[in-house]
Amino acid sequence: ARRKRAATHPPVATAVVAAILGLKDRKGSSMVAIKKYLAANYNVDVARLGPFIRRFVRKAVAEGMLVQNKGSFRVNKTALPKKKKAAKKPKAKKVKKPKSAAKKKTNRARAPKTKKNRN
């Protein structure tokens, strides 16, 4: 049995969604435009991938991931998995040394100065 070679392109589902997002057509991208995009950017034989592309598009429309408008398809933004924001690492709080309590000046009752006799 021959070993299966790893594909040089991403999975069809990923590539089609990337194509639709990359084309940025307001009303959606046609199947022809999607195939042209895949051929140009992923260097694949679109004639061979045609059935896989059609199957994915039908499945994605049924699941609500893509929205079909006549012959065009656009990505349903609400159905896309949201990218998780990288969890922010809590910053190590600098341990503040408590300031030494300011010494309160105490007004001591001082003994009145006595005049020295200079005799």
UniProtKB/Swiss-Prot annotation:
Name of the protein in question: Histone H1B, sperm
Q: What GO terms in the biological process aspect are recorded for it?
A: chromosome condensation; negative regulation of DNA recombination; nucleosome assembly
The entry's localization annotation reads: Nucleus; Chromosome
The role this protein plays is: Histones H1 are necessary for the condensation of nucleosome chains into higher-order structures.
UniProt lists compositionally biased (Basic residues) regions at 80-119
Q: What Pfam family does this protein match (any one)?
A: Linker_histone
Q: Which species does the entry assign this protein to?
A: Platynereis dumerilii
Record keywords: S-adenosyl-L-methionine included?
A: no
Keywords attached to this entry: Chromosome, DNA-binding, Nucleus
Tell me which InterPro entries the record gives: Histone_H1/H5_H15 (IPR005818), WH-like_DNA-bd_sf (IPR036388), WH_DNA-bd_sf (IPR036390)
Q: Name one GO molecular function term.
A: double-stranded DNA binding
Region Disordered, annotated ranges: 76-119
Q: Got a GO cellular component term for this one?
A: nucleus
